[in-house]
Amino acid sequence: MSFMDQIPGGGNYPKLPVECLPNFPIQPSLTFRGRNDSHKLKNFISEIMLNMSMISWPNDASRIVYCRRHLLNPAAQWANDFVQEQGILEITFDTFIQGLYQHFYKPPDINKIFNAITQLSEAKLGIERLNQRFRKIWDRMPPDFMTEKAAIMTYTRLLTKETYNIVRMHKPETLKDAMEEAYQTTALTERFFPGFELDADGDTIIGATTHLQEEYDSDYDSEDNLTQNGYVHTVRTRRSYNKPMSNHRNRRNNNPSREECIKNRLCFYCKKEGHRLNECRARKASSNRS
């Protein structure tokens, strides 16, 4: 199998002279697909340019090949077609990057982003899933669109009343701090399954189901007319999940409640004092085993 046949992404790629193919390092984690990840394109190009600045390149063709090896379909197929049309030995790297940007970059739709955010709530998802999905959607927001204070307000509207009050008490200064405080002050049972309790072995007893929001990767209705001002007045979602069944014979309710853990400064995971959840050795050991 030739070197060019090993390039991922499919499609035929023009042959290059051997001197155009130095032993440059490939980073599997640095990729751009060109499908539902337009918001990642600027960072992708920046990281590619940073990596390339540390390597001596014989010509533009080798730089194009390096960038191309970090593309997945459909971006990879576009690169193949674009280079075929321009000619691999004639096209410049700047022209290639400019073409990639113009073809795949789409300005973020603020209304769609806010519409997706308003579908989230701690009551429906638990704090773990809420944080995961909020981060994924928030990454699509333009970097300077909101102040940190506005970002914190947007996030805390999704929390339950109890969690909201605790986060507010800590007075977080950044969105990251607010999300961490919400995670730390919510009991383990509430993170994945809101309202559920733990049995004697610490396993979650699934006594109810929740309706989860579909991933934001799918396209939204073009008739969506949610405005930013309308979103500001959106009322936070209240708990709407089904209450778990209470007739489990083997259930033990001797675990400290969330309020007791907070009051007595106990770890939410092992129920012992002297450390917070992110410092819990038992939790880290459990994560390593899984």
From Swiss-Prot:
A zinc finger (CCHC-type) spans 265-282. GO terms for cellular component: cytoplasm; retrotransposon nucleocapsid. GO terms for molecular function: DNA binding; zinc ion binding. The modification N-acetylserine is found at residue 2. The record marks 207-208, 233-234 as: Cleavage. GO terms for biological process: retrotransposition; viral translational frameshifting. The keyword Nucleotidyltransferase does not apply. Changing residue 267 to S: Reduces level of VLP formation and maturation. InterPro entries: Ty3_capsid (IPR045358), Znf_CCHC (IPR001878), Znf_CCHC_sf (IPR036875). Pfam families: Ty3_capsid. It is found in: Cytoplasm. Keywords: Acetylation, Cytoplasm, Metal-binding, Transposable element, Zinc, Zinc-finger. Retrotransposons are mobile genetic entities that are able to replicate via an RNA intermediate and a reverse transcription step. In contrast to retroviruses, retrotransposons are non-infectious, lack an envelope and remain intracellular. Ty3 retrotransposons belong to the gypsy-like elements (metaviridae). The N-terminal domain of NC, but not its zinc finger, is required for nucleoprotein complex formation and its chaperone activities. Capsid protein (CA) is the structural component of the virus-like particle (VLP), forming the shell that encapsulates the retrotransposons dimeric RNA genome. This is Transposon Ty3-G Gag polyprotein. The gene is TY3A-G.
